[in-house]
Amino acid sequence: MQTRTNSSRWTQEHNATATQADAWFENYRFHDGESLARLRIHYATLGSPHRNAQGQIDNAVLVIHWTGADGNTLLSKNYMEALFAPGRPLDANRYFLIFPDNVGHGKSSRPSDGLKAAFPKYGYGDMVDLQHRLVTETLGIEHLHAILGMSMGGMNAWQWAEAYPNATDGIMPVVSMPIPISGRNMLWRRMVIDAIRSDPQWNGGNYTSPPQGWLSAFPLMRMMLDGVPHLQVVVPDGPAADRFIAEAQSQAAAVGTRGDKDQGVRTQLCRR
């Protein structure tokens, strides 16, 4: 089942219109056995599908976001100009681009819709399964030209290659390796989880407002995501350090307002 909402136009001259829509999956069963009566996957598309001589769409590219983001993040001006503008690698005049919000993210079904701690525990396998169903069942695409994924989205792309080896011509995982989460990546996620669970507002997952305690710890986590040589350049002195911390806290606050940092990060860690 599919519903469409108002479309939003990219201002780049001669380019396509980005269309927002929802796909609904009834009685969806997650990998761990839990189920949801109705599950929504929100997505956007950019460009127009091209059909080959057999009537099949042959120019579709799935573009998958990272942890805590959503499909519309990739429709921002910077990504548009770098990737999807005329003459760029994924020119929207040539390709039919699909930007899903993964379960637990953006406008797709997520814990803060009401179930909170009772929301089924989901993992990367569920994300990839829902992406596949969106592509094949909702959009009627039998074969993708490519899959571009960033960070968590890159891990999803690797899983596509394993689960559906004939479903795409190729994958483009960015800042992602086909190995379990470890090292600094594991550490900063654990820090986020601990900061949330130790917050009194967490209330065992039955929060009445999003926990805020993790915001104060985020600058340390943000530092762990950066490289030491780069930090030497951007933080040469005390005032620069203050700016770095303030900007990190602002980033954390922005992520927090988009929803389920609690459930989203936890499930990325524990479930593949």
Where are the regions a protein language model picked out?
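Catalytic nucleophile-loop/oxyanion-hole region of alpha/beta-hydrolase
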Residues: 114-126
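N-terminal cap/lid subdomain of alpha/beta-hydrolase-fold enzymes
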Residues: 44-113
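Conserved acidic catalytic loop of the alpha/beta-hydrolase fold
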Residues: 125-146, 159
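Conserved alpha/beta-hydrolase "nucleophile elbow" surrounding the catalytic nucleophile
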Residues: 149-151
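Catalytic-loop region of hydrolases
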Residues: 1-60
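Short glycine-enriched nucleophile-adjacent loop
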Residues: 154-165
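Alpha/beta-hydrolase fold catalytic core
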Residues: 238-272
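Alpha/beta-hydrolase-fold enzymes
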Residues: 167-168, 173-251
